[in-house]
């Protein structure tokens, strides 16, 4: 049996109701919570492991989560890539626009976006724009969207595969979660042929809609050649 255990971050029994009421935003920033709240999921995962259960330790969005997650000895760790890549692309676009124009309206848009995506809390509506710029810059730099490592949104996957290779958890696998979009599977497919990861293909699991995975059996020129074949079979020369 594999039991799914989520990271809880700053969410606890006292504030979880905030996610269900009003604007559904949390009043605590993701990085300003209590240690006991951050490690709630880790403790649960370890207890389950001690009782003989396998754990799928989920809600892993950033590479920095992986080292601590592996200490819980999970059967699965995760890389959430789809929404993360979209968010990174949007932040990078607004930050680039600000850096070219120094128009604070771009930072104001970033601030609203970061509140909506929980980089900032619901109480940060008037957060200093210099803080907003710093958070945006650090996010873009860490996720390496302007570099070969992360231009495809796969920086977290690369990191997690390296962590698995260098761990002593031979049974642990990486789930790449909820991929979709015209480039996500093709980019992951190319990543798995990179020489660095040729020994890790049996450590990765993909989760997605069957219809999305199935569409990657097709290509535009299949139609082109089927047209030729069918018309040739119909007697056309």
Regions found by a protein language model. Give the residues of each.
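Active-site entrance/lid segments in N-terminal catalytic domains of soluble metabolic enzymes
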Residues: 1-31
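Short acidic, S/G/P-rich loop/turn micro-motifs used as interaction or catalytic elements
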Residues: 8-17, 84-85, 180-186, 211-214
């Amino acid at each position: 049996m594999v039991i799914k255990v989520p990271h809880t971050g700053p969410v606890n029994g006292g504030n979880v109701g905030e996610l269900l009421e009003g604007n559904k935003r949390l009043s605590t920033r993701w990085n300003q919570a209590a240690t006991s709240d951050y490690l709630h999921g880790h403790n649960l995962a370890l207890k389950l492991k001690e009782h003989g259960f396998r754990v799928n330790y989920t809600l892993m969005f950033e590479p920095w989560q992986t080292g601590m997650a592996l200490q819980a000895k999970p059967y699965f760790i995760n890389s959430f890539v789809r929404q993360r890549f979209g968010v990174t692309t949007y932040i990078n676009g607004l930050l680039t626009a600000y850096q070219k124009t120094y128009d604070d309206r771009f930072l104001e848009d970033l601030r609203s976006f970061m509140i909506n995506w929980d980089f900032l809390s619901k109480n940060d509506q008037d957060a200093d724009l210099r803080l907003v710029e710093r958070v945006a810059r650090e996010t873009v730099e860490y996720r390496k969207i302007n570099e070969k490592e992360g231009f495809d949104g796969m920086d977290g996957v690369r990191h997690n595969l390296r962590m698995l290779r260098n761990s002593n958890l031979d049974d642990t696998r990486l789930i790449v979660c909820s991929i979709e979009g015209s480039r996500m599977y093709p980019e992951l497919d190319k990543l798995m042929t990179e020489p660095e990861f040729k020994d890790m293909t049996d450590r990765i699991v993909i989760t997605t809609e069957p219809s999305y995975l199935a569409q990657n059996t097709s290509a535009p020129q299949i139609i082109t050649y089927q047209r030729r074949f069918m018309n040739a079979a119909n007697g056309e020369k």
